[in-house]
Swiss-Prot record:
It catalyses: 3-methyl-2-oxobutanoate + (6R)-5,10-methylene-5,6,7,8-tetrahydrofolate + H2O = 2-dehydropantoate + (6S)-5,6,7,8-tetrahydrofolate. It is an enzyme of class 2 (transferase). Its main location: cytoplasm. This is 3-methyl-2-oxobutanoate hydroxymethyltransferase. Keywords: Cytoplasm, Magnesium, Metal-binding, Pantothenate biosynthesis, Transferase. Homodecamer; pentamer of dimers. Its EC number is 2.1.2.11. Pathway: Cofactor biosynthesis; (R)-pantothenate biosynthesis; (R)-pantoate from 3-methyl-2-oxobutanoate: step 1/2. Belongs to the PanB family. The gene is panB. SUPFAM superfamilies: Phosphoenolpyruvate/pyruvate domain (SSF51621). GO terms for cellular component: cytoplasm.
Amino acid sequence: MSQAPSESLSATAYGTLPPASTPSARKPLSLPRLREMHAHGEKITMLTAYDATFAAVADAAGVECILVGDSLGMVCQGLSSTVGVTLETMRYHTECVTRGLRRSQGVAWVIGDLPFGTYHESKEQALRSAVVLMQAGAHMVKLEGGGWTTETVRFLVERGIPVCAHLGLTPQTVHALGGYRVQGKTDESAALLRREASALQDAGASMLVLEMVPAALAAEVTQQLTHCATIGIGAGSGTAGQVLVLHDMLGMNLGKMARFVHNFMDGAPSVRGAMEAYVRAVKNVSFPDNSVHAW
């Protein structure tokens, strides 16, 4: 005879969603709380998730921010890049993630990626797209790009929509960049990245993903920004936080693993255990190791 599910679990027809790891000690993440963490130098942890179960497990493992990334185009849909991901797809997966968090009484901060072509035409187009993801349950939207996005960021923030910006390698423009390559390696490109980071902070961005930029440059930008938390991926350990694609950190990549990825599933007792190991490693700054995972 099977046991009835514990009251601390959210039962489904096919299993259970885990509760937050220590519900009494964890409060819902908010923008003021994330700013407080940044101000006190506490590392911010972020992972991608695309469905209810993985979102709930990540939250239970202590991950503070869940990015519903357009990377789902590559890891879930089999696309060769993120360019083909649609706003409707992002809305659907954002709803899945936030539904899972509600059912498991999760506390994570949810960020929805604005896909390619949904914010490029005008500020008004960006607002319409952002509203779709916010109504799907996102707490913040993310968009890629430098100086040309600053007025869009300002426009959204002025209308009450928190924004995470994204510099360095911007996967939506991978064709223009000539592939997945480290950015900011020259003095000129590094100076441009620093200027754009400051402009995005001034426009109101609360977070800034730095992807595949030299560790020294990422650390410099992090120190330069006083009220915009940098989140690194392939940008060394000097950023305010870290993000990885879920499938990568679980070792579910059948191709060549990117330099900045670590397989946290190796030696872990479970998926949740792997996520908890990731959180610990980011918090104690043992991941990323600049000699292994950065440039």
